[in-house]
Amino acid sequence: MAIYIVKEGQLQMTGSETNIDLNSLNLDSSPWLKSSDIELYDWSSHTFYLNTNKEKGKYSGRHFVVASGDERLFLGVFFPIYMSSFPQIPSIMAMDDFITPNDIIQFGQLGHKFTGEINKTDNFKQALDSSGILHNGIEVELVNLKKKNNTTVDYTFKVTNLDTETLYLLDPDKMGNSRFHYVTNGVNFVQNDTYYFPENIQHTSFETVPESWYIKLRPGQNMVRTVGLSGFSNLPEGTVKCWFSFPGSIIKAGEWKKRDGRIWMGNYFVEKEIELR
């Protein structure tokens, strides 16, 4: 498994480069990311965990090809954060130590969809599995949505460790709701074309995550948490389409690996029709 930079002058960055003959592209002779750099790939967040640091910012606007051996799997782009449009092909944010450290490479997503629908690329998943680096990560389910009053809801979610190793996950019961809502906007939903989302979410900012804010889930274990969220206006009742994003942690390079497992990184987006009562 490797990622090669496409030599300049062959492609324009439009964000929607499709139907490209990958075998016609001239690539750098040496891979930007080689197999020995990769510790694992988490399928639930489409994230490479590395044993080295990789610069991303200097490749802003450049294209890359993900390959397995001699097979070129798909085209992607280092997407500049200043672009007003969104890529329609797999993307990596072209920023160093921004959102993710340089020993984490995460493919971009728009809501529950990864750009280029990388989650539907079976040949990529098979190649990861054949390389022995594929990990299943987590599964997140939105369990319950309760209306406390016209401006506040309690939402309940369940996170299950589908992986083969212990995962460190942010725990709202340990870090507090206001800190949890610094890294996620919680829930929002729609009913009859009317959208409901909290305004001025009460959150507490932070720069580092102490060990005490994590829950450690062994393989097969789960956590169920109920979190309160205020700031809505005139909440409805009945069936709504609800969205929730479970967040990964904030870490620096070299911190993801633990003696007994790893810190889960990324975002797991849930979309579900659910009763608000």
Name each model feature, range by range:
Residues 38, 211-217, 230-232:
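Beta-strand-rich interaction surfaces with strong enrichment in secreted/lumenal proteins
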Residues 1-139, 183, 265, 269-277:
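A structural signal for conserved, well-ordered secondary-structure elements
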Residues 147-149, 157-167:
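Asparagine-centered strand-capping/turn motif at beta-strand->loop junctions
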Residues 140-143, 208-213, 226-229:
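Short structured motifs
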Residues 169-222:
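The feature marks short-to-medium sequence segments in extracytoplasmic or secretory-pathway proteins
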Residues 226-277:
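Terminal connector regions
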Residues 49-52, 224-229:
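Exposed aromatic-hydrophobic patches
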Residues 60-61, 150-155:
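Short, solvent-exposed loop/turn segments enriched in Ser/Thr/Gly
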